[in-house]
Amino acid sequence: MAYYSRGGMGSLPPVVRTFLIVNVVVFVAQSLIPGLTEWGSLHYWTSSQFRPHQLITMMFMHGGFTHILFNMLVLWMFGSVLESFWGSKRFLNFYLICGIGASVVTLLSVPFTAAQFAKTASEASEGYGSLQIIEMYKQQYAALGASGALMGVMAAFAYLFPNTELMIFPLPIPVKAKYLIPFYFLIDLFGGLGIGLVGDNVAHFAHLGGAIIGLVIVIIWNRTNRKTFY
């Protein structure tokens, strides 16, 4: 059984290194440029703030230091392996497809999550009906983060390297990828279906969409022995 660990930062492949730099630069810019976060975050398509570019830009926006730190660690750990295994062009296309696909799934899921939220909120609100709450939810909805694309990366990693052992804080023992990453998927599935905390400000369906799209792509590539995707 292999024990998984990454080498030094100097060994980073070019696409992963570029994405790390871009995400950090954008994160700093978010605190310096008024309106940048709203411009780049994904709004629902009936909102006056929705723009098509947000399907891409949302994956380079983050909501806080912990958010970007975790995502960049995932990109470094798993993305570096996949880029080295596939090559830069193939990894770039894979990452962007997973990210854009996650954005589309997010938009498709908004009516469902809005109804979930309205069911809970209408019980505590005064003067607002469920339909009004749903419409306000849609107009105010905004999603951001690289997590959708990265769930696709993690799903591909688990498929290609299922027995690789991962050390995940705070667990004291290594866990194989084929167990750990499906566990994260189930957390998002339960969260997306409202089994647990509703309105937890996590785009669970973006994560699920990215993971499913990533898994489908890597299965197709593996079965057809495709060496390129560009």
Please give the residue ranges for each predicted region.
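A detector for small-residue-rich transmembrane helices and their helix-helix packing motifs
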Residues: 1-230
